[in-house]
From Swiss-Prot:
Residues 34-209 form the BPL/LPL catalytic domain. It is found in: Cytoplasm. It is an enzyme of class 2 (transferase). The active site is at C171. This is Octanoyltransferase. The gene is lipB. Keywords: Acyltransferase, Cytoplasm, Transferase. The lineage of its organism: Bacteria, Pseudomonadati, Pseudomonadota, Gammaproteobacteria, Alteromonadales.
């Protein structure tokens, strides 16, 4: 667990295109040192498919007019779009004294505990990172660790057009069904989901203080 006085800085980015946020994550990670602060970026993206480092082109079935971007995270192809909460933890896991597997577990548990606030029984799977409800995937994970620091993160389906998921094999699984929060009487908006996830994420990682920022610059 981190020190009790560890602060987590929350950046509320609103809706921003994927590539600009991705490159900002890379830049922050490349330039950080042992004094750099841990941040959690909360964002919503316009429609985009992102293909992880393990991704295979055959899992992109029919992208149509939605762009496909090859990125430097783990995992296979996924979809981001309006109505989906995306959260990027930019953490010094060396300083936190946790490994990547523990970080994945902590992220999954923060989602599970957030959904439990609404009476939704969600769970992770050992062989397929992410969070599931009744065998349907409600949240996807894909991380990258560089210099002992994390970037990329999670995507939670809240209230979105789910049809683009039918154009891919989500996370490389043909026929994988997806779920979202609103029909399950979970959080009804990305904003509501973000507020609750910030709470459970900071508790799961042991952060005692939160500081909020708007946009990518202070």
């Amino acid at each position: 667990m981190p020190l009790k006085d560890t602060v987590l800085h929350i950046r509320h980015l609103g809706r921003q295109d994927y590539e600009s946020v991705w490159h900002a994550m890379q830049e922050y990670t490349d330039n950080r040192d042992e004094t750099s602060r841990d941040e959690l970026w909360i964002v919503e993206h316009p429609p985009v498919f992102t293909q992880g480092q393990a991704g295979k082109s055959e899992h992109i079935l029919n992208p149509g007019d939605i762009p496909v971007i090859q990125v430097d995270r783990g995992g296979q192809v996924t979809y981001h779009g309006p109505g989906q909460l995306v959260a990027y933890p930019l953490l010094d896991i060396k300083r936190l004294k946790i490994g990547v597997r523990q970080l994945v577990t902590d992220i999954e548990q923060s989602i599970v505990k957030m959904l439990a606030l609404y009476g939704i029984e969600a769970y992770p799977k050992a062989d397929a990172p992410g969070v599931y409800v009744e065998e349907r995937k409600i949240a996807s994970l894909g991380l990258r660790i560089r210099k002992g620091c994390s970037f990329h993160g999670l995507a939670l389906n809240v209230d979105m057009d789910m049809s683009p998921f039918q154009r891919i094999n989500p996370c490389g699984y043909a026929g994988l069904e997806m779920a979202q929060c609103k029909p399950l009487k979970g959080p009804q908006s990305v904003e509501e989901a973000g507020e609750k996830l910030i709470q459970t994420f900071s508790q799961e990682l042991g952060y005692q203080h939160l500081e909020h920022h708007q946009g990518l610059t202070d």
